[in-house]
């Protein structure tokens, strides 16, 4: 039986971040994901790298300070999929007085180490404003946007770059301690093939399933309860042409974002609803749709109805149960629990956490694991660049360089490659000299060469992996085009299997 230094169960942002950090410190690492990378909470976020302005109201200064500092780090680590964005906050005096917002924004500007992002300012909305005429004043501040699912993917690629192993569609079925080691058993969810490994340490980063894996996978008591809080978003055709996002205050003291997305759409979200069901079956409720439309329509001149919605997505945040009364008051901070057996076979479990602070969470996890590994390397991720991030400049400059090297690329395709694959675009394009070298076009300039790259280098096995997580081509491809992608994947997988045998 093969022995690993560390097995990480869960292929969301926290699992991938911990696995990448550990592999880079010289540990032999295996990451197991039961379905697809980022298939649950990590692809259902608001897609922001943000300090969390509203968390200041709950006195979460440590969390906000850490998150603010991380924005600058992540912009450097993944400049192809993360970029700065300005946020406009319409002032509604009966909800929060201007002095309170000014204090909050002053703290937001100064709590974290801000080197590249501009500070906050006051605003007056004139006649040309997209907001209703009664909204005359507001504020503007900086945060960042990120492609959440691709941030997970880049970390998984880093695991492999640093010598680790990543298996998707491989479900960990049990883990037990034996003679100072973990015995981990898993099965391939497609073929039923069984695997087992030994490991010196184990990480439970299963997100919404963290407590369930304690109960069913390890038959151990979970050190903390978990509260599942559902967050849903609606997507509509772009509601305005400005680059800025809007952060809207609502009567219930919650906030809702309106975020420009992929040049053609706006994301509106999120909700905060206690959730008791199966995390895999999570979907938006009618009441959430009405809530989000109502908050939006209260603020904007351009009104929206249900018919404008082109897509919705929902996810559950697995938050550590701190017995708060309301979903929005529960801490978004993370809790790491570690325990061992006679100084060996540590189990580190992740409760809670945010996309923005995943790298610090991973660093803290490795601090807790370090005493169990002789000769483990030091922290290293703060100065690293994730796979695809070596674009030397900004994304649009890189897209222009791609077009010079591959003159047959349209502007839109070069931009898509630059903003999706970054410096890995050249691996995708290889020696292509004409557009016909890219193979079949499945629709919306989604060519065979891209899909082949996704299978060979990004763990894509099913159409959803390619169309809704590695890319968002599902927003444009119709049902027939999507089923052609599925068919191609089956044929290509069979071809690879016959070559391998």
From Swiss-Prot:
Conversion of glycerol 3-phosphate to dihydroxyacetone. Uses molecular oxygen or nitrate as electron acceptor. PROSITE patterns: FAD_G3PDH_1, FAD_G3PDH_2. It catalyses: a quinone + sn-glycerol 3-phosphate = dihydroxyacetone phosphate + a quinol. The keyword Flavoprotein applies. Pfam families: DAO, DAO_C. There are two sn-glycerol-3-phosphate dehydrogenase isozymes in E.coli: one is aerobic, the other anaerobic. It is found in: Cytoplasm. Pathway: Polyol metabolism; glycerol degradation via glycerol kinase pathway; glycerone phosphate from sn-glycerol 3-phosphate (aerobic route): step 1/1. One of its GO terms (cellular component) is plasma membrane. Its main location: cytoplasm. Belongs to the FAD-dependent glycerol-3-phosphate dehydrogenase family. GO terms for biological process: aerobic respiration; anaerobic respiration; glycerol catabolic process; glycerol-3-phosphate catabolic process. PANTHER family: GLYCEROL-3-PHOSPHATE DEHYDROGENASE (PTHR11985), GLYCEROL-3-PHOSPHATE DEHYDROGENASE, MITOCHONDRIAL (PTHR11985:SF15). Its EC number is 1.1.5.3. GO terms for molecular function: electron transfer activity; FAD binding; glycerol-3-phosphate dehydrogenase (quinone) activity; protein homodimerization activity. FAD binds at residues 5-33. Keywords: Cytoplasm, FAD, Flavoprotein, Glycerol metabolism, Oxidoreductase. Its cofactor is FAD. The keyword Metal-binding does not apply. This is Aerobic glycerol-3-phosphate dehydrogenase.
